[in-house]
Amino acid sequence: MTQEIHYSVLLKESVDALVTNADGVYIDGTFGRGGHSRAVLQKLSPQGRLLAFDKDPEAVAYGRELAGSDNRFSMVHDSFVNMASHWASAAHANNWSLSGVLLDLGVSSPQLDQAERGFSFMHDGPLDMRMDNSSGQTAAEWINTAEESELAFVIKEYGEERFARRMARAIVAEREKSPITQTLRLANIVSEANPKWEKGKHPATRAFQAIRIFINRELDDLTATLAQSLEMLPSGGRLVVISFHSLEDRIVKRFMRDQARGKQFPIGMPVTEDMLEKKLKTLGKAQRAGDRELAENIRSRSATLRVAEKL
């Protein structure tokens, strides 16, 4: 397959933080176009192993091509939210111990730029937005059937869009004329309902982000996967996460902080010592892309890297 152009954000920083043992076994929860996976493989010895996940069929095709040329690598067509069961089977069969988990939560550039995937407010295409376009509800199906109150809630909650109610009203009014099935039509509807555009940001950005997050259950899956990773990792294992907007980063930051502090309970509640146990150690401060990377890839401007180690 011809490799599409995609820049893996914070590549060196994330892979250096992840790979502490060249003979170790690692998980890349979001293969995408394989930039991080290839960088991990470069740091692994012949004994090292990498297991990657993605629910996007196109990404899986690239991953299987890589698996065919490198026997240290395996590709799984599934969401990272299901990685614990896959890992349990692989670990039992091969007597593996997990050295680290990497989650790059960004949508890959090819996904954003391919009109037919339905993520873009810049290119017209069918209003889909599913990461796995072989199953589940499309954005168009939801947009054309959801109550106005649900539309407003999703756009506000997952897009942090202050004009969510206006956008929801506009969507309902327009879909009564005819179903909304194309990305540019939706982009125009929500843009016209946004009276105060943020400088340098398309007026449909937040609404499209919100709908994508909702359709793919991104925040629910992230929360569940962080908890799974903690259970899967042994002492010394690394959890490396790259987030791309404040909602994701808030979840990651809070999870790592809470697990580094240990559980908090109300005064007077009877607890055992293991219930108070600290389970993670955060490593350094959150990292952002440097000037050079920003110049090469403007989409890296919103990326935040956080790293923690299992105690």
Curated annotation (Swiss-Prot):
Location(s), subcellular: Cytoplasm
Record bears the keyword Ribosomal protein: no
Chief localization: cytoplasm
GO terms under biological process: rRNA base methylation
Similarity remark: Belongs to the methyltransferase superfamily. RsmH family.
NCBIfam families found in the cross-reference section: 16S rRNA (cytosine(1402)-N(4))-methyltransferase RsmH
Protein known as: Ribosomal RNA small subunit methyltransferase H
Gene: rsmH
